[in-house]
UniProtKB/Swiss-Prot annotation:
Calponin-homology (CH) domain residues: 1-133
The protein, known as: Rho guanine nucleotide exchange factor 7
Binding partners and assembly: Interacts with PAK kinases through the SH3 domain. Interacts with GIT1 and TGFB1I1. Interacts with PTK2/FAK1 and RAC1. Interacts with ITCH and PARVB. Interacts with unphosphorylated PAK1. Interacts with SCRIB; interaction is direct and may play a role in regulation of apoptosis. Interacts with FRMPD4 (via N-terminus). Interacts with CaMK1. Interacts with BIN2. Interacts with YWHAZ. Interacts (via PH domain) with NOX1 (via FAD-binding FR-type domain).
Xref: Pfam families: CH, PH, RhoGEF, RhoGEF67_u1, RhoGEF67_u2, SH3_2
Region (Disordered): 580-655, 678-704, 748-773
Location in the cell: Cell junction, Focal adhesion; Cell projection, Ruffle; Cytoplasm, Cell cortex; Cell projection, Lamellipodium
Gene name tied to this protein: ARHGEF7
Annotated source species: Homo sapiens (Human)
UniProt GO BP: ephrin receptor signaling pathway; focal adhesion assembly; Golgi organization; lamellipodium assembly; negative regulation of microtubule nucleation; nervous system development; positive regulation of apoptotic process; positive regulation of fibroblast migration
Amino acid sequence: MNSAEQTVTWLITLGVLESPKKTISDPEGFLQASLKDGVVLCRLLERLLPGTIEKVYPEPRSESECLSNIREFLRGCGASLRLELLFPPSQPPQHLVTTILLSASTFDANDLYQGQNFNKVLSSLVTLNKVTADIGLGSDSVCARPSSHRIKSFDSLGSQSLHTRTSKLFQGQYRSLDMTDNSNNQLVVRAKFNFQQTNEDELSFSKGDVIHVTRVEEGGWWEGTLNGRTGWFPSNYVREVKASEKPVSPKSGTLKSPPKGFDTTAINKSYYNVVLQNILETENEYSKELQTVLSTYLRPLQTSEKLSSANISYLMGNLEEICSFQQMLVQSLEECTKLPEAQQRVGGCFLNLMPQMKTLYLTYCANHPSAVNVLTEHSEELGEFMETKGASSPGILVLTTGLSKPFMRLDKYPTLLKELERHMEDYHTDRQDIQKSMAAFKNLSAQCQEVRKRKELELQILTEAIRNWEGDDIKTLGNVTYMSQVLIQCAGSEEKNERYLLLFPNVLLMLSASPRMSGFIYQGKLPTTGMTITKLEDSENHRNAFEISGSMIERILVSCNNQQDLQEWVEHLQKQTKVTSVGNPTIKPHSVPSHTLPSHPVTPSSKHADSKPAPLTPAYHTLPHPSHHGTPHTTINWGPLEPPKTPKPWSLSCLRPAPPLRPSAALCYKEDLSKSPKTMKKLLPKRKPERKPSDEEFASRKSTAALEEDAQILKVIEAYCTSAKTRQTLNSTWQGTDLMHNHVLADDDQPSLDSLGRRSSLSRLEPSDLSEDSDYDSIWTAHSYRMGSTSRKSCCSYISHQN
């Protein structure tokens, strides 16, 4: 490898330069672009000698900030890389003190920023690499990547014993040292964490495994043997086994082992402090960001009257309480870091505040979907307001990001605590609390995500139109107490259907999703009065289930997604049924009709012509939907989200005209189309089982039609002989009679008239045809006109015959 490739590898190994996602064709160009802003250089010097960098711009946005970072690196090199290397007393006196100085005048800051004389920059880094390799700096770990923010120096690094520093000096002398079985004092280490190999030459192990080190290399990777397998592993994942713990080997050898002072304990302590300081700094930064969002944007917006008070409350949520809580948390962590390391209880601090934190963040996440809805509806006004307050364009994005910070911060806690645990001593008093805190934060983060998803779905249901909705608007039911997606199984049926249950103060609403998940379909409502909730034990047929029963409700089995969802439903329903039983004891069953099947009742608003009708179920107070054969089902058959469209079989019976419609039914239908179709259904005659017509029946029906036609003609003649007033009255009577008997007259008319007569039967009309008044009226108007023409022809022929 050339010098540029070696330098890139060195920086990536130290963790100060991110590894590129693809192969680098020009290492020197990649290195020049990476070093231009000076951030990587400052990270490098801080990695080698923590506390050296005093001021750094993590994300420089101007030329001056980039040059400031580069000059800070050069200043740190000139001030700090004068290292006194003290050798053990056994060494010759002339080697007691050696001074190595890296000149800071090797390259100029402007040269690096402008891309000039990059060879000088590269030469300086190569020299720095060689110097630090000789004295053993920066080779302790490659797994822990420091924060991009400034990391302060700690006393634990400055107070390392002379013996430890001497051991680091000799670490370079023992690199590439092959330790064979003849080694007398072979280095033995014990795994502190689990490690899974990602390459073939790496060694996998579990926590607690004892590994025999066969080679110590710079860069943080050692070679060792475990259970007959040899491979490379990260050195900061293990700790050296003390002399009292080492197994006695009967074999002897001549090769030396590394100095006894070479231990990772001091390194882990230093990184523990680094991680803890990082937690404190990021926590303080997060608290300041919340204060900025409140003081700069939300509080002025509250007094500007640009939005209603309700929308302002949605945007604010409980952000004020969270901000106050985070300030208190920062103070608690600062007090904790002032204690000696052995007495620091960071995990205990988080555990003590977890109940309060859980309440605050769950409340915030439940309100967040409503806040997003306000942001969407008033994006223009809010964007303009934010920009007037100094926010960068687009201003709405600044507010959206600010309102998302609480749950974004919540997701980071498990990772931060995991890193703290990695660099903690095995027998630290706070280790168990750290582990409990990690589990608590993971659980809280999952709950917050679930609450957000549920509230987003709830908001969608309350704001969008629901297909086949019956009764008053959904907003009149009150606030949603609880909702989730469940599986519903009715008594006597083995089929389970996905449903969305929404619990309101007095009603349990049941919805299903459309096949394309584009909306929701109304399935029914159950009154909470008289409802009995029974929690069921898990079995082979159901898990996390409860049962709904009652005097007016047929037994329903509800299966929840998890145990937490089950507990929430049982508690809310039991509490709700007690409240409604005391406060609202009399609720009429028919006031909350329930459709247990995805039925499409014959109402003017229904648009599902080919849907399968629902059966009659008095226990749920469903509408009397007839089956295909005219007989109601006796058992409930739960269908899918939407019933499939199945074509009806055709037979000769389809040519048979339907029974005539009673005029009272038509008048009732025209009177009020918005009411429930129960009244109209009662007026319709029940269909008898269909059978093929015989010749005798056809002749009888034809003769009856002829007699009725003669009666009509006589009435017409009588009307012509009376006064104008009487003729007008009889004309109305004739039209009503014609309306009532048009199906019979249609049998002797032409085929097209017979086809139109079949369409006139209300019992055979599809629901979509009944949805429009104009279509319904046009059918009867056409019949009256055609029947009137036929009767007038018959009348003329009769008069001519009499004459």
